[in-house]
A protein has these predicted regions:
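Bacterial signal peptide processing site
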Residues: 22-25
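Sec-dependent N-terminal signal peptides
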Residues: 7-14
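N-terminal secretory/targeting leader peptides
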Residues: 81-204, 234-435
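Post-signal peptide N-terminal segment of mature Sec-exported envelope proteins
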Residues: 28-73
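Helix-enriched interaction subdomains in cytosolic or periplasmic regions
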Residues: 50-52, 64-70, 77-94
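C-terminal motif of bacterial Sec signal peptides marking the signal peptidase cleavage site
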Residues: 16-20
Length: 435
């Protein structure tokens, strides 16, 4: 009964997403957020002891080997090229969970503990997050694609990075962890061109648009590929949900002149926006945001709906106002240590792992749509106010966004204009497809 209820809640959530949670920059208030979302106590879809939030219950994944079970069919070769997803956000989220369920079932044919090669991957986010679910699913895909030979152990909540989130990429580069999941914007100067995706002037409507645009931009721009290549071997780079401007306050904003004090935002365009409105940049790891907002240290927050849901930032006493426009989504990346990747190539598993990385990962990236629905639902259910900018305020914001884009282009070298133009072209194209 509990499992049936959990599945029903997910289906309610994804249907509600289509009805009330479109793109953040659409100018339409999110007046009817979903009534339900993934329960906070429920483990991620592919993590140990999870109840699979998919339309149909799935067999246990690689973390639950079954004695005497009929082996599932090995993973099929990955389809070539970028997949086509549903135009409707609710259907995309539903399909993504179904895809994860299939990966889990394929992985159940193999025992992770018997894998010949075991590697570690550090993730800043908790298990109960889109990032956690996404990475557990990728680990399942790798286990199945290598026929049980390679297992990637996902260390959520910085389990393998004692130095904290800001050290994740360096931990991977130095060989202290084999793979990493992180945000390029945490590392100022490491991959400046990749931060083009964060420009709010692009008007990214949702996670699916951001993810497809970021990945396609990376594939088409050698200058961006070169930035990442100096740090490790690329598995996948995409973008998260759009970010509202959130705060603990007592009224709606009506002008950019009211945006003052300390704002937590990532490197690149987000911090340029903070400069543009005359506020102060306040840096801290995402795990420290909850107390810093509660205690009034942070006045405003630029972070995505997924993080609002995963880190419980909509709890009473934390955030309660959400300016519903995209101040900027952030890039995500999964990379391998260069020496580790050479070892994987030597052992003959590089092609198998790459077959379930990159384009293939786009098949389940839309689980972030579900977490946006949860973030919005949490906000309203806890008494928060989600509102769009209107009139002169909307015009002021657009001017600020345009100024940020021009500054970003001027400060990022000869390739910046071409990278920005390509990113804008992709965003416009995918905005027309994925609502």
């Amino acid at each position: 009964m509990k499992k049936t209820l959990s599945i029903a809640l997910i289906l309610i959530m994804v249907i509600a997403l289509a009805a009330g949670c479109g793109g953040n920059d659409s100018g339409t208030p999110a007046s009817q957020p979903p009534a339900s979302a993934p329960p906070a106590s429920q483990p991620p879809a592919s993590s140990p002891d999870a109840q699979q939030p998919a339309p149909q219950p799935a067999a246990p994944g690689n973390d639950q080997p079954q004695g005497g079970q009929e082996p599932a069919a090995p993973a099929q070769p990955a389809p070539a090229g970028v997949p086509e997803l549903a135009a409707d956000a609710a259907k995309r989220a539903q399909d993504a969970y179904a895809f994860i369920a299939n990966l889990k079932q394929q992985a159940s044919a193999y025992d992770k503990n018997a894998a010949k090669y075991k590697y570690t991957l550090n993730c800043q986010d908790p298990a109960e997050s889109a990032s956690g679910e996404f990475l557990y699913a990728w680990s399942d895909a790798v286990l199945a694609a290598t026929e049980g030979a390679v297992y990637i152990d996902i260390g959520v909540s910085n389990a393998y990075c004692a130095g904290g989130t800001m050290e994740a990429l360096n931990y991977m580069k130095d060989g202290l962890v084999d793979f990493c999941f992180t945000l390029p914007c945490y590392f100022k100067g490491y991959t400046p061109l990749a931060l083009a995706i964060q420009n709010p002037a692009l008007g990214i409507k949702n996670i699916t648009v951001g993810a497809f645009s970021m990945w396609e931009m990376y594939k088409s721009m050698p200058a961006v590929q070169a930035e990442f290549a100096q740090h490790g071997e690329m598995m996948f780079v995409w973008a998260n949900n759009p970010s509202p401007l959130s705060y603990k306050g007592n009224k709606e904003l009506t002008s950019t002149s009211e945006i003052k004090g300390n704002i937590r935002g990532n490197n690149g365009p987000a911090q340029m926006f903070i400069d543009e409105v005359g506020a102060s940049v306040y840096g801290c790891p995402i795990g420290d945001v909850y107390p810093n907002v509660s205690n009034g240290v942070i006045d405003y927050l630029i972070t995505d709906w997924h993080a609002i849901a995963s880190f419980k930032l909509a709890d009473p006493g934390v955030l309660n106002y959400y300016l519903d426009t995209n101040i900027g989504c952030s890039a995500y990346v999964v990379m391998a240590n260069s020496d580790v990747w050479k070892e994987i190539e030597k052992n003959g598993y590089a092609d198998a792992i790459k077959s379930v990385s990159g384009d293939y990962c786009l098949n389940w990236v839309s689980i972030w749509e579900a977490y946006e629905a949860k973030g919005r639902s949490d906000a309203v259910n806890n008494g928060g106010t989600i509102y769009p900018p209107t009139g002169a305020f909307a015009t002021e914001l657009q001017t600020a966004f345009d100024n940020v884009a021009q500054r970003w282009i001027s400060e990022n070298g000869a390739n910046a204009q071409a990278v920005y133009n390509k990113t804008a072209e992709l965003v416009n194209s995918y905005n027309a497809i994925y609502k």
